[in-house]
Amino acid sequence: MKHQRVIVLGAGVTGKSVAEFLHSRGSYVIGIDGSLDALNSCSFFHERYLDTIEEFPEDMDLFVRSPGVKPSHSLVVEAKRRGIPIVTDVQLAFQDPEFHRYPSIGITGSAGKTTTVLFLVHLLRSMGMGAFAMGNIGVPILQAMREKGIRVVEISSFQLTEQEIETPVLSGAAILNISENHLDYHQSLQNYSEAKRNITKCLQSVESLWVGEWLSPGKSYLDYTKEIASVLDKGSALKPLYLHDRSNYCAAYALANEISNVPLEAFLQALQTFEKPPHRIEYLGEKDGVSYINDSKATTMSSVEKALIAVKENVIVILGGRNKGSDFTSLIPILTQTVKHIVAMGECRNEIAQALSGSLPLTQARDLQEAVSMAQSIAQPGDVILLSPGCASFDQFRSFEERGDCFRQLVGDMEALRV
């Protein structure tokens, strides 16, 4: 990459990690972003332009698109028209010799990626192996690949979109599931699905692809569930696991076996000491007979459905936020089985009301605080108040984590919960 002229579109956390990496490889880096402050906060750009730039920089060798930048962006379209290779940070990492020093695993899917990545790292470390989580999990891959150990990479559909360069580096990979998600970005489920399946272009061998649910081609890691379930269901000392969690852990088990032979006993021991990340069907406690569950990570209809299946009945569910192109009517079958009342909040509350008001009692709330207050006024002993929004958080919050923390604080404003 030495002496190459490279455009980096996006100067957020990922874009800055890309700029630093390219600078270290001797590239001439041109940064483009909608924020001048973001551009100026990165010292690795040789030139800086706002994304309203009218003249496309000349003689460019490479174009790096930050994951959040849509392929329809005018500068991306122009780069494609000029025949300039377009990559993401993940593709850059996969092409770099430093990444190849250790085995690597890639994990993608609509839901469960972070839990699976973190458990796989935990499992490998419990067996004495160095392993590191990186990628879409919040740790830029171009920074984390400096670590000495197995690379476990969470990869989003954004990072796999328009995978123009095949980089067969992964020792194993999993597509956990595919359901409607980010349709505001990908425009169709087919485009979204194709982006996820691009992970196969990164595999050393397609025989090392593991898939869940009805997906094909690939080996099904769900084959492990029978063996593992038989152990878990025999009075195991392990805490109860939701069905979707079992699926995620089985995926990690299958992928770990692509690296090394992992005894079932080692897997079960790792389960005993693993702490699931927050905001994922997280039980907060009970007060006055009402239970509270934080599932702020649920930003798709499929994730909401999994939460409702896990909780089962007497649910007051808080839905809403910023819709990502999902169809709320797809929830009607599971809602009518498990939910007694819907509280629709935020930017798309009217849209939710139009889609669901005929199926169940529904109340609208302007924001999360009002939604929690309304849910509490409706709840009776034995009920569950479940925050499982099925939407992005950006109408009220900077992230799903901030939304979940706010829910926890609102719940914590009451007397101490009994956990």
UniProtKB/Swiss-Prot annotation:
Cross-referenced Pfam families: Mur_ligase_C (PF02875), Mur_ligase_M (PF08245), MurD-like_N (PF21799)
Keyword field contains Glycoprotein: no
A molecular function (GO) term: UDP-N-acetylmuramoylalanine-D-glutamate ligase activity
InterPro entries assigned: Mur-like_cat_sf (IPR036565), Mur_ligase_C (IPR004101), Mur_ligase_C_dom_sf (IPR036615), Mur_ligase_cen (IPR013221), MurD (IPR005762)
Catalytic activity annotation: UDP-N-acetyl-alpha-D-muramoyl-L-alanine + D-glutamate + ATP = UDP-N-acetyl-alpha-D-muramoyl-L-alanyl-D-glutamate + ADP + phosphate + H(+)
Binding-site residues, ATP: G109, S110, A111, G112, K113, T114, T115
Biological pathway: Cell wall biogenesis; peptidoglycan biosynthesis
UniProt keyword list: ATP-binding, Cell cycle, Cell division, Cell shape, Cell wall biogenesis/degradation, Cytoplasm, Ligase, Nucleotide-binding, Peptidoglycan synthesis
Record-annotated membrane-spanning stretches: none
Cross-referenced Gene3D superfamilies: Mur ligase, C-terminal domain, Mur-like, catalytic domain, NAD(P)-binding Rossmann-like Domain
GO terms classed as biological process: cell division; cell wall organization; peptidoglycan biosynthetic process; regulation of cell shape
Enzyme class: ligase
Subcellular localization(s) per the UniProt record: Cytoplasm
GO-annotated cellular components: cytoplasm
Superkingdom, natural source: Bacteria
NCBIfam families from the UniProt entry: murD
Primary role: Cell wall formation. Catalyzes the addition of glutamate to the nucleotide precursor UDP-N-acetylmuramoyl-L-alanine (UMA).
Family: Belongs to the MurCDEF family.
Protein's name according to its UniProt entry: UDP-N-acetylmuramoylalanine--D-glutamate ligase
Provenance organism: Chlamydia caviae (strain ATCC VR-813 / DSM 19441 / 03DC25 / GPIC) (Chlamydophila caviae)
